[in-house]
């Protein structure tokens, strides 16, 4: 029988990751209790989203069961939040008898996007395109690299021709710094099909960047979390996106020590979508109206263009909160329109390729 390759994210996961939902949540409660006893000076980010709802219920049940000290809860308001989310945060605080402090960024979403640009497709793609716009490296270097017989020599030449542009060269040429092709990784432009050709034929007329997330969420979080020993978040593997490489210990992606000496705890990391649905049904958890009434499947910074469903989601929100939809279009509209152009371009290219056989 042929061996099946399993990544370390799979092979190094703890045994409870494969338990059924009831047993898994029981195991997680024990883990929560252990870490809260060891690190009682803990802070938890509560977003008002569905993962956060499962997490706060699990944390508070565990606290009551093991008589553990209170957790500091914070809600980071980016400045572009639905009323449904803000109302739900208040209702959740009342439900559990806890305080959920609202924290606002020093640089708001409007200021951040005006100064740095707006996201497009993904955080990785936004970072790559932002650097390309800043460095002004021509897209033609990708053709040079593709056509070069000695790709390592060509990569070296490009480094000398465009100093201090390492990441941009790798991004555009879909290679690494040694000149080895890396066409199938997330850190290159063609991780989004035909993107390099698209921006060549339809250059963006606006600034692209995902720094709004840094300024409106990450910086605010670092400011508030710095005095706590343990930071608790609702991150889950089933969400996808960027994840850290696991260490040798099998709980590396659930519980880690940061370079600052703090601990980062993700109690829901191995909770699947099915586990989450079971918990909601079994304990009768009510999500915010954004889910239960509007019909959204995810929430966050309203209308963030990194979501491929951003425009569709805004239309679900519009009947209930037209003003926040208008604000999202004013802030992210250029990115929405450019995404629509890219999607149309991609489909046309796929159709053309299929017709040619």
Feature locations, PLM:
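ATP/NTP-dependent adenylation/nucleotidyl-transfer catalytic domains that generate, transfer
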Residues: 2-14, 40, 222, 251, ...
